[in-house]
């Protein structure tokens, strides 16, 4: 009787993802496989060897190496997906409680939104270095473009701008987006476009427009790493002590709107989220001062009126 192997199953699944152009997902599965192989200490992992005790030990192994709970969840869900497919194909034994006690959820992380003053410094601090000014303009534009994700910003095309409106589809979900280009955005974008490659379809120079397939994915991940390094340098130059990444811009946009009383439904639509639950993860909790003031006002609106009647 043939013995089927999880590692081989994952490699086949990764190959299928690459064929579909889902390079980010393929990398996630490859990372999970590499980690599980290191834990097992061998290249072949028979499905018949995998049981709940083994997965619990693997979970402890990851935590001992200071992996976050979200990393644990990601790796375990990748294993569960491939094991489930093997089970459907009769290649792995049925096990109802295989993942019982294994963390498969999402731990809410510390929110990435920046304090308003830090955000203001990043946007407005005078800078001498041309590269830092370029990063500053990009940050301002991403904020002006409704907290646009870097992946969408980098992939904006010249043809996406028509009649003063930016029309594009989100890279992650395909959601169609419309953003009116404000006058200040035109100035910032014109300054960035001076560097745009003449023959490139892209609005900005993060991507060359000459790569396809997995090469294009690698070019994008390199551009993201470069941009995050530039943001770190910008923060240092502006005296901002918080960690600043491309995610900070998006989270800060959402939290600023929340603090201004904008309904979460509108914030969700502006961000292009398909679920309000996703938006809630982005939003930083209100400050204690703000919550105390609202609580006090709520009480007084009733108590003071009752006191007058009494």
Where does each model-flagged region fall?
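Basic, Lys/Arg- and aromatic-enriched nucleic-acid-binding interface segment
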Residues: 101-150
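Conserved tyrosine-mediated DNA breakage-rejoining catalytic core shared by Y-recombinases
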Residues: 155-191
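N-terminal core-binding DNA-recognition domain of tyrosine recombinases/integrases
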Residues: 12-24, 33-110, 125
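Short, basic (Lys/Arg/His-rich) helix/loop patches that form interaction surfaces
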Residues: 130, 228-269
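Catalytic-site neighborhood detector that most strongly recognizes the C-terminal catalytic loop/helix
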Residues: 113, 170-174, 271-296
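Short, charged phosphate-coordinating catalytic segments
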Residues: 84-91, 142-163
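Active-site/catalytic core of tyrosine-dependent DNA strand-transfer enzymes
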Residues: 119, 182-241
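C-terminal secondary-structure termini that scaffold catalytic or DNA-interacting sites
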Residues: 198, 207-214, 297-310
């Amino acid at each position: 009787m043939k013995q089927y192997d999880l590692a081989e199953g994952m490699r086949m699944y990764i190959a299928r993802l690459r064929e579909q152009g889902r390079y980010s997902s393929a990398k996630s599965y490859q990372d999970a496989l590499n980690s599980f192989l290191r834990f097992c200490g061998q290249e072949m992992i028979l499905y018949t060897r995998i049981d709940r005790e083994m997965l619990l030990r693997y979970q402890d192994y990851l935590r001992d190496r200071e992996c976050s709970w979200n990393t644990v969840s990601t790796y375990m869900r990748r294993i569960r997906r491939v094991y489930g497919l093997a089970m459907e194909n009769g290649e792995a034994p049925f096990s109802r409680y295989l993942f019982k006690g294994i963390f498969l959820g999402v731990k809410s992380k510390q929110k990435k939104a920046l304090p308003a003053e830090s955000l203001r410094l990043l946007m407005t601090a005078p800078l001498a270095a041309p590269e830092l000014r370029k990063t500053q303009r990009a940050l301002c534009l991403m904020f002006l473009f409704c907290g646009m994700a870097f992946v969408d910003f980098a992939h904006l095309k010249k043809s996406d701008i028509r009649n003063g409106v930016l029309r594009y589809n989100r890279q992650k979900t395909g959601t169609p987006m419309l953003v009116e280009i404000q006058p200040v955005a035109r100035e910032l974008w014109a300054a960035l476009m001076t560097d745009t490659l003449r023959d490139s379809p892209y609005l900005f120079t993060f991507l060359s427009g000459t790569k396809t397939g997995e090469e294009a994915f690698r070019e994008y991940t390199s551009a993201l790493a470069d941009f995050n390094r530039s943001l770190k340098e910008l923060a240092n130059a502006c005296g901002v002590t918080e960690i600043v990444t491309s995610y900070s811009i998006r989270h800060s946009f959402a939290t600023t709107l929340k603090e201004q009383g904008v309904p979460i439904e509108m914030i969700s639509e502006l961000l292009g989220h398909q679920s309000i639950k996703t938006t809630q993860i982005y939003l930083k909790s209100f400050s204690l001062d703000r919550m105390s003031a609202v609580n006090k006002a709520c009480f007084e609106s009733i108590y003071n009126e009752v006191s007058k009647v009494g």
